[in-house]
Swiss-Prot record:
Catalytic reactions on record: 1-(2-carboxyphenylamino)-1-deoxy-D-ribulose 5-phosphate + H(+) = (1S,2R)-1-C-(indol-3-yl)glycerol 3-phosphate + CO2 + H2O
Entry-linked NCBIfam families: PRK00278.2-4
Record-level Gene Ontology MF annotations: indole-3-glycerol-phosphate synthase activity; phosphoribosylanthranilate isomerase activity
Organism: Chlorobium limicola (strain DSM 245 / NBRC 103803 / 6330)
Keywords (A to Z) from UniProt: Amino-acid biosynthesis, Aromatic amino acid biosynthesis, Decarboxylase, Lyase, Tryptophan biosynthesis
Protein name: Indole-3-glycerol phosphate synthase
Length: 258
C-alpha cells in the first residue's frame, strides 16, 4: 500500500467521526458571524523578479518522522514573517504529520497573513470545517479525488469564501485540475506514492499550465539554486516546509513580500 493510500484510508475513518460534529449545519448557523477570508490568491501572485513564499508550519512527516522537536507554531510563524513569507501553510493531519487544527487556529489569530489548511480533503464536511476553524484556503489533491469531486469541491469552496490550491504531480493531473477550473495549481515534486522527489517535475509541467493560473512549486526546494530554477521557470510562488529547517541557505533568499 502506498503512503497516499494509507493516509486516505485513515482519513476515511476521520471523516466518519467528523459527520457526528455536523460541520455543515454549524457553518450555516455561524456563517453570518464569520470573518471574511484573507486574500490567499492575491498574496501569491508574482509581480516582480522574486518569488512569493508559502511557509509551511510542520512538525513531522511520514518519510522523515519528527522534523522539529521543540515545535512551537507561533515562534515558527514569527520567524517565517521575518524571512518574507506571503502566506502560511499549516498541517492539520494528526496521525501522519502530527499536525493539529489548534495550530491553524492559533497562527490565524496571532498573525495577519492568509493561512492554507494542509490536509487530505476527501469529503465536503472537511471543507465546511476548514471555514469554521479560520482557514483562508484549502488544499485539494487531484490524486486523492475523482474529477467530479474536484469540480464540486472547488465550487463549494468558492461559495463559502475559501481559496483552493489544487495539487498535481503529472500532466494528466494538471489537465484534470485545469478542466475543473482551478485558479491556483501547485506541482508537488514529491511523489505521494513513494515519496521520491524531483525538481524537474515542476519545471517540466510549467509550460502546460493554463494562462492566468497562479503557479506554485512544492517540495524538494533546499537551495538558492533550486529557487533560481523555479523562478526562471516562471512560477509565482513556492511552498517550503522542511527546507526552511534543514537549509540555512534558504534564509538568505529574497522573496517578494506581501
Amino acid at each position: 500500500m502506498t503512503y497516499l493510500a494509507k493516509i486516505l484510508d485513515e482519513k476515511r475513518h476521520e471523516v466518519a467521526e467528523l459527520r457526528k460534529q455536523r460541520p455543515q449545519q454549524r457553518y450555516e448557523e455561524r456563517k453570518n458571524d464569520l470573518s471574511s477570508c484573507r486574500d490567499f490568491a492575491g498574496n501569491l501572485k508574482r509581480t516582480g523578479e522574486n518569488l512569493r513564499l508559502i511557509a509551511e508550519i510542520k512538525k513531522a512527516s511520514p518519510s522523515r518522522g519528527v522534523i522539529v522537536h521543540d515545535f512551537d507554531p507561533v515562534d515558527m510563524a514569527r520567524r517565517y514573517i521575518g524571512l518574507g513569507a506571503s502566506a502560511f501553510s499549516v498541517l492539520t493531519d494528526r496521525l501522519f504529520f502530527q499536525g493539529s487544527i489548534d495550530y491553524l487556529e492559533t497562527v490565524k489569530l496571532q498573525f495577519h497573513l492568509p493561512v492554507i489548511r494542509k490536509d487530505f480533503i476527501i469529503d465536503e464536511r472537511q471543507i465546511f470545517e476548514s471555514r469554521l476553524i479560520g482557514a483562508d484556503a484549502i488544499l485539494l489533491i487531484v490524486a486523492a479525488l475523482e474529477a467530479s469531486q474536484l469540480r464540486d469541491y472547488l465550487q463549494l469552496a468558492a461559495e463559502i469564501g475559501l481559496a483552493v490550491l489544487v495539487e498535481v504531480h503529472d500532466r494528466q493531473e494538471l489537465d484534470t485540475a485545469a478542466e475543473a477550473g482551478a485558479g491556483i495549481i501547485g506541482v508537488n515534486n514529491r511523489n505521494l506514492k513513494d515519496f521520491s522527489v524531483s525538481l524537474d517535475t515542476a519545471i517540466d509541467l510549467r509550460p502546460h499550465f493554463p494562462e492566468g493560473v497562479i503557479a506554485v512549486a512544492e517540495s524538494g526546494l533546499k537551495s538558492a539554486d533550486d529557487i533560481q530554477r523555479i523562478g526562471q521557470a516562471s512560477f509565482d510562488a513556492v511552498l517550503i516546509g522542511e527546507g526552511l529547517h534543514v537549509s540555512p541557505e534558504l534564509h538568505n533568499v529574497t522573496w517578494q513580500k506581501p
